[in-house]
Regions:
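Substrate-agnostic recognition of the 12-TM MFS/MFS-like secondary transporter fold
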Residues: 9-25, 48-62, 68-81, 99-154, ...
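Helix-loop junctions on the cytosolic side of multi-pass membrane transporters
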Residues: 116, 120-121, 162, 166-193, ...
Length: 404
């Protein structure tokens, strides 16, 4: 696959940009916490980062269809590089929030154009291998990014990590600059972007409301965003405050995130074999029970236990994600898939924004151990209940019987 020059350049650009984003997942919370020492402000920064994705989810895909995708990617990379290079020089929370929001806008606009460009440079028969290579690379980046950030931060501070992130975006821009995409004939737009977005949102919402599988998966993924929030906000405070490891907090937090990502990557690699043995419903069930691994935090276990819990959480989370994505793809007609994915992404991102806001408020009041345990119990037990209440489990069983 990498022998195809255009795909190789696009793949390298994806790799570099994703590495930059992975570095920021560790560096951003550390920068905010070092500056403010506040869980509420840390949660608020991530709310601000996520809200642009909620607004742009249905529009960004249409921009990728109407505008030159190469120019979108190049502009997004250069803009993000310039913005994150400013972060080490900020001294106020509102400055970080503004830059974080603008970078999030760039991420939201670039992603659909990036996905849409892959089929343009790969023959139809090689699309699955191309996507597989991209997925494996993304899994590796999720491990390397936090580990790299940990190394930089351990030696210096969070600031230089953003310089490294800016370099990643510049490398991505260099790859895109040399990329040539084939010309695409686009039909003239018959409606304004706003009207088209309203129509697509309506179509997507109808499917989410009326299809029990899509409805259930959307609801449980929104609930799962609480886990994402505690991994960023609460785990950092657990290390810095509960374990009283302020001097080593940056390094340990980075390594914990890398451990979770390693679990996700390894879980993805073995998911297919596990599915063949136990079936997809059990694969997804085990994945959605994974947050129960956060409950041991209530007794403040030693660090090795926390590392093990996060590894298992990531390992089984990958099973839930893979099973969920497969069910989602099978439940939605191809003609509606783009609109449903856009609506689903917007809904889950909205859940993420609410989750970060709630966890930022809850963590200093309950304390990190109790917050981790509470979220683990609520999501680990509540996820399967949500799937049952929404009719998702019954619909999956009917489909399994019909397909037998």
């Amino acid at each position: 696959m990498l022998a195809i020059p255009a795909f190789r350049r696009l793949w390298l650009a994806q790799l570099a940009a994703q590495l930059g984003e992975a570095i920021a997942l560790v560096a951003m919370p550390l920068l905010v916490y070092d500056l403010t020492g506040s869980a509420e402000l840390l949660g608020a920064i991530f709310v601000i980062q996520l809200l642009p994705r909620v607004v742009l989810a249905p529009i960004a895909g249409m921009l990728a269809d109407r505008l030159d995708r190469r120019r979108i990617l190049l502009a997004a990379d250069l803009a993000r590089a310039g913005l994150v290079a400013l972060l080490p020089f900020t001294g106020l929370a509102w400055q970080i929030a503004l830059i974080a929001m603008l970078v999030a806008l760039g991420n939201a606009i670039a992603r659909p154009a990036e996905l849409a460009a892959v089929p343009m440079v790969v023959p139809a028969g090689l699309l699955v291998p191309a996507l597989s290579i991209s997925q494996v690379a993304a899994s590796v980046v999720r491990i390397v990014g936090p580990a790299l950030a940990a190394g930089v931060i351990a030696v210096t501070s969070p600031g230089p990590a953003f310089g490294l992130q800016a370099l990643c975006f510049l490398i991505s821009a260099g790859c895109i600059f040399t990329l040539t995409l084939p010309a695409v004939s686009r039909a003239p737009a018959t409606t304004t972007l706003l009207l088209a977005a309203r129509r697509e949102i309506g179509d997507g919402l109808r499917v989410v409301r009326n299809n029990p599988i899509v409805r259930g998966i959307t609801a449980v993924e929104m609930l799962w965003q609480l886990v994402t929030a505690v991994l960023v906000v609460t785990v950092l405070l657990y290390v810095a405050v509960t374990l009283r490891l302020r001097d080593e907090a940056a390094t340990i937090f980075s390594l914990l995130m890398a451990t979770f990502a390693a679990g996700t990557a390894i879980g993805s690699l073995v998911a297919r074999r596990v599915e063949e043995r136990i079936g997809r419903p059990r694969l997804m069930a085990l994945g959605y029970l994974a947050p129960l691994m956060l409950i041991p935090a209530i007794v403040t276990p030693p660090l090795p236990v926390l590392f093990a819990c996060l590894f298992v959480l990531g390992f089984t989370d990958a099973w839930a994600v893979i099973a969920m994505q497969t069910y989602l793809a099978e439940a939605v007609p191809d003609a509606l898939r783009g609109r449903v994915y856009a609506t689903w992404t917007g809904a889950v991102t909205l859940g993420g924004a609410a989750g970060f806001g709630l966890i930022g408020w809850l963590t200093p009041r309950l304390g990190p151990p109790a917050t981790l345990a509470l979220v683990g119990a609520v999501v680990g037990i509540g996820g399967p209940i949500v799937l049952w209440v929404t009719g998702c489990i019954a619909a999956m069983r009917r489909d399994a019987v019909a397909g037998a």
